[in-house]
């Protein structure tokens, strides 16, 4: 069973595509590739989009069960841990994308392009936690304003801050 996260308005975003194929139309394929070549946790990072028949709204679902919380509603330390983990997973996906996209003539080139597009999203608050598992909504979209660039999840996070500094060892 999937966990509902939120509904997005399509008119507030611009869909990203490669070779005329919208990234969100390839959810099942990219998640299969990610799970096969990386891990189920990597694949769970990518929320499942459900477009309404009129293509005006998108319902987003997590592929894991649990309590869903937007990153903006988490305590600061927990939010930073989630962002760091999301960035780590995203960098692995980006690396796979780069490997597959090296040869523009290969069968994997389009899949590599799609893997890169799933890391693009319009706003920093597109990240959710489902019982600690990072889940990205609104992926495959850029902000609606003409010329506005999407966020790149692979640039999120970084090193988790150390709680206490380790004292240097004195030379004997």
Put a short name on every predicted segment.
Residues 1-171:
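Cytosolic/nucleoplasmic/matrix-facing N-terminal domains/tails
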């Amino acid at each position: 069973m999937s966990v509902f996260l939120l509904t997005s308005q399509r008119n507030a975003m611009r869909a990203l595509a490669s070779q005329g194929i919208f990234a969100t139309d390839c959810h099942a394929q990219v998640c299969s590739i990610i799970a096969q070549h990386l891990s189920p946790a990597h694949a769970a990072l990518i929320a499942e989009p459900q477009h309404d028949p009129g293509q005006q709204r998108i319902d987003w679902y997590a592929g894991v069960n649990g309590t869903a919380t937007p990153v903006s509603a988490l305590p600061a330390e927990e939010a930073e841990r989630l962002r760091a983990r999301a960035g780590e997973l995203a960098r692995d996906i980006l690396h796979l994308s780069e490997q597959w996209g090296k040869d523009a003539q290969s069968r994997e080139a389009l899949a590599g392009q799609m893997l890169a597009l799933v890391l693009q999203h319009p706003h920093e608050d597109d990240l959710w936690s489902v019982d600690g598992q990072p889940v990205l909504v609104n992926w495959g979209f850029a902000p609606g304003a003409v010329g506005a660039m999407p966020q790149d999840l692979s640039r999120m996070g970084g090193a988790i801050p150390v709680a206490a500094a380790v004292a240097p060892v004195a030379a004997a």
